[in-house]
A protein has these predicted regions:
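Extracytoplasmic substrate-binding proteins
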Residues: 147-215, 306, 315-337
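Bacterial Sec-exported substrate-binding components of ABC uptake systems
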Residues: 2-15, 19-77, 180-209, 277-284, ...
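Short helix-initiation/N-cap motifs at beta->coil->alpha
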Residues: 58-59, 113-120, 249-258
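Alpha-helical, coiled-coil/dimerization segments enriched in small aliphatic residues
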Residues: 97-100, 219-254
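Ligand-binding pocket segment of bilobal, Venus flytrap-like solute-binding proteins
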Residues: 234, 250-279
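A short, structured surface patch at a secondary-structure boundary
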Residues: 71-126
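Proline-aspartate-enriched helix->loop->beta-strand connector
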Residues: 124, 128-134, 150, 262, ...
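Structured C-terminal subdomain patch of bacterial secreted/periplasmic proteins
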Residues: 268-337
Length: 337
């Protein structure tokens, strides 16, 4: 099997061995259906069993999964990205949400496993998967899916970079592609450093989500890219953009703001995610149309042609994974052109 799918060329480096909090893996031996010994690997994480945010309750969960599994079902798009980029093939996924740029990672006869929020349990059980991967929006499906097959949750927890390293390293072990995983991570680390070098001299920025004709500002995450802080945390904390405002309220889709807010704080760059484009909202006005008005034209970002439209699928739907992180890097590097 050729493990690593092609990436855009970025400089390579060597990634050191990773030992990340909240994740533990161990290779074990098991017996498969034919009676032959089969290798397995375990994954440990703190599973959210109740509540959200400060009220969330967690339970340490360890799941043993087979190496080189067959009939893998993936609900988490970032995991679909990484699993496929490392040479794995996905048998089932929420096909209505899988982006076109990841379609090559699906088997030719891939089945629809449901949506990002709801699983087709009957169809999944009929396909007899050996591994199910969830994360983010699909995390709540764990109890039902774990009754069908070994199920692991690869949601972002804390640092975006540490999560990317943890998940890529683990999936590399599952697929026997450890070296390829390390090389891919090195490539992305170099790309992120290149992007940070560009943003270091770019003045201030504001991460902005546009949806339904309304604007919302994204908050810096303080290093925690989980949940409500995710998108702003990435542009500021990972890619080094200096926030024009520090005290934005952390919310699932950001803090609602007016067009006048943009003039008042006047960032040098606007980093825009078009949520309606990401979700395929019918008859929605594009973010570029919404921002093409007399008020926005008063901002430095508009005058200097510094309104950067980020890939909406990568930044809103997938949000992680090897190929998607490369797309994010390229989005940020637009300002160097």
């Amino acid at each position: 099997m050729s493990h690593l799918r092609p990436f855009a060329a970025l400089s390579l480096a060597v990634v050191s061995a990773l030992a990340l909090a909240g994740c533990a893996t161990a290779t074990e031996a098991a017996v498969d259906a034919s009676g032959a010994e089969a290798e397995t690997i375990s994954f440990t994480w703190d599973r959210n069993v109740a509540g959200e945010g400060e009220d969330a309750a967690y339970e340490e969960t360890t799941v043993v999964v087979p190496k080189n599994p067959n009939n893998v079902v993936v609900f988490d798009m970032a995991s679909l990205d990484t699993f496929g980029a490392l040479g794995g093939e996905i048998a089932g996924a929420p096909l209505g949400s899988a982006p076109a740029y990841l379609s090559d990672y699906l088997s030719e006869d891939a089945f629809n496993s449901g949506t990002l929020f709801e699983a087709d349990l009957i169809e999944i059980e009929a396909q007899q998967p050996e591994l199910i991967i969830i994360g983010g929006r699909s995390s709540a499906l764990y109890d039902d899916l774990s009754e069908i097959a070994p199920t692991i949750d690869l949601s972002i927890r804390g640092s975006f970079i540490e999560t990317l390293e943890r998940n890529t390293t683990f999936l590399g072990k599952v697929l026997g592609a450890e070296e390829e995983a390390a090389e891919a991570l090195a490539e992305l680390k170099d790309g992120i450093e290149e992007a940070r070098a560009v943003t270091a001299d770019a003045g201030t920025g504001l991460a902005l989500m546009v949806s339904g004709g309304k604007l919302s500002a994204q908050a810096p995450s303080g290093g925690d890219a989980t949940g409500r802080n995710a998108r702003g945390g990435l542009i500021y904390d990972v890619f080094g953009v200096t926030p024009v405002v520090d005290d934005i309220e952390a919310a699932t889709h950001g803090e609602p703001i007016s067009f006048e807010f943009l003039v008042e704080h006047n960032p040098d760059f606007l980093w825009v995610v078009d949520r309606d484009a990401a979700t395929g909202t019918e008859d929605a006005q594009p973010a570029a149309t919404i921002l093409d008005n007399a008020i926005v034209e008063l901002t430095t970002a508009a005058k200097e042609d510094h309104i950067i439209y980020l890939n909406p699928t990568a930044w809103y739907i997938v949000f992680g994974g090897l190929e998607t992180t490369r797309i994010m890097i390229d989005d940020v590097l637009q300002i160097a052109k």
